[in-house]
Amino acid sequence: MKLHEYQARDILARYGVPVTGGGVATTPAEARAIAEQIGGRVVVKAQVFVGGRGKAGGVKLADTPEQAEQVAGQILGMNIKGLTVEKVLVAEAITYEREIYLGAIMDRASRRIVMMASAEGGVEIEEVARTNPEAIVKVAAHPMLGLLDFQARDLAYGIGLTDAKQARQFAQIATALYRAYMDVDASLAEINPLVVRADGSLQALDSKIVLDDSGLFRHPDLEAMRDASDEPEAEQRAREAGITYIKLDGDIGCMVNGAGLAMATMDVIKLYGGEPANFLDIGGGASKEKVKTALQIILSDPNVKAVMFNIFGGITRVDEVAKGIVAALSEVQTNVPMIARLVGTNEEEGRRILAESALIPAATLAEAAEKAVHAARAG
């Protein structure tokens, strides 16, 4: 679950990260009131879950409260990469001499939380990793002891913060970011940029936190921050139904039970020259209603030219899945060809149910993938 910038900065501020003054506004009048409280120059920033806000006109400076009101009126309601701006962050605009990147992320290879810093702040860290990987300094936090003081200082020295006072403040901010990351069950937390002001002090200008959905049951206060308006309708519907769904760029819809089997299914589709349109795991013990909802979600993607079912019935009963597919097809009028490979518990009954439909049967995963790719190309 993604948090907006204003939500992330509020969390980091509670941990002692120095942030600029400001607040969130939903109307131009609210933006003016916040600018009046700040006094002086402000920056008005669109709050949407996409990058490139500045290039799209979603970040503007204002010298007066009147200007802030005018600028907010221009940004609110703006469409940025398909998302409508409903909130803006009005924050103090400051001058600075240098931009730094600081982030925390899970490194699955080492199974540690890795803290990263770079002297090349203000740009996407992925771009820095591609063009100048030597500019990124990393330390792995101890799983029991956490981020140690000397590691935080090593990050500071590694990006050229050699002044003792400056390095000490950076270490404090890095430790605060790490603590926030751990406490809120984040999968990503970053400050970009963390700027160096003329007096040598550090201040966070932009921040980002992505929460691990699996940990949200521990944080009802954070769950309440979810902004469904910026979540694609299909993903929102899938989440509410307990279905794991991620839209991709291909044209072959996939419905599978089990994350590992779903990834293997996508691999085999690509092996036969196709492109998956989605990752969809209906989970174990899927009911008829859940299967019906999953199929409706898949077919809501206009790019889908074929649908492939790959169900291995252990906990999940194949006949229940078959009933769900037939029920969905009775409600959704579609000419999209569908290929089904269903094996396991009650598979004979499941195949009997599907035999009365227009689905194309397949005995193996390879056969199903090959037929799905052929059907998508023919469509």
Curated annotation (Swiss-Prot):
Cross-referenced InterPro entries: ATP-grasp, ATP-grasp_succ-CoA_synth-type, ATP_grasp_subdomain_1, Succ-CoA_synthase_bsu_CS, SUCC_ACL_C, Succ_CoA_ligase-like_bsu, Succinyl-CoA_synth-like
Binding site for ATP: 45, 52-54, 94, 99
Cofactor: binding comment: Binds 1 Mg(2+) ion per subunit.
EC class of the enzyme, as a word: ligase
MF-aspect GO terms: ATP binding; magnesium ion binding; succinate-CoA ligase (ADP-forming) activity; succinate-CoA ligase (GDP-forming) activity
Gene Ontology CC: cytosol; succinate-CoA ligase complex
Chain ranges passing through the membrane: none
Record flagged with keyword Endoplasmic reticulum: no
Gene3D superfamilies the record matches: ATP-grasp fold, A domain, ATP-grasp fold, B domain, Succinyl-CoA synthetase domains
The protein's annotated pathway: Carbohydrate metabolism; tricarboxylic acid cycle; succinate from succinyl-CoA (ligase route): step 1/1
Occurrences of domain ATP-grasp (ranges): 9-237
UniProt-listed SUPFAM superfamilies: Glutathione synthetase ATP-binding domain-like, Succinyl-CoA synthetase domains
Cofactor(s) required, per the database record: Mg(2+)
Reaction it catalyzes: succinate + ATP + CoA = succinyl-CoA + ADP + phosphate; GTP + succinate + CoA = succinyl-CoA + GDP + phosphate
Residues holding Mg(2+): 192, 206
Top-rank lineage group of the source organism: Bacteria
GO annotation terms (biological process): succinyl-CoA metabolic process; tricarboxylic acid cycle
UniProt xrefs under HAMAP family: Succ_CoA_beta
Subunit structure, interactors included: Heterotetramer of two alpha and two beta subunits.
Biological role stated in the UniProt entry: Succinyl-CoA synthetase functions in the citric acid cycle (TCA), coupling the hydrolysis of succinyl-CoA to the synthesis of either ATP or GTP and thus represents the only step of substrate-level phosphorylation in the TCA. The beta subunit provides nucleotide specificity of the enzyme and binds the substrate succinate, while the binding sites for coenzyme A and phosphate are found in the alpha subunit.
The name this protein goes by in its record: Succinate--CoA ligase [ADP-forming] subunit beta
Species assigned in the record: Roseiflexus castenholzii (strain DSM 13941 / HLO8)
Phylogenetic classification of the source organism: Bacteria, Bacillati, Chloroflexota, Chloroflexia, Chloroflexales
Gene from which this protein is expressed: sucC
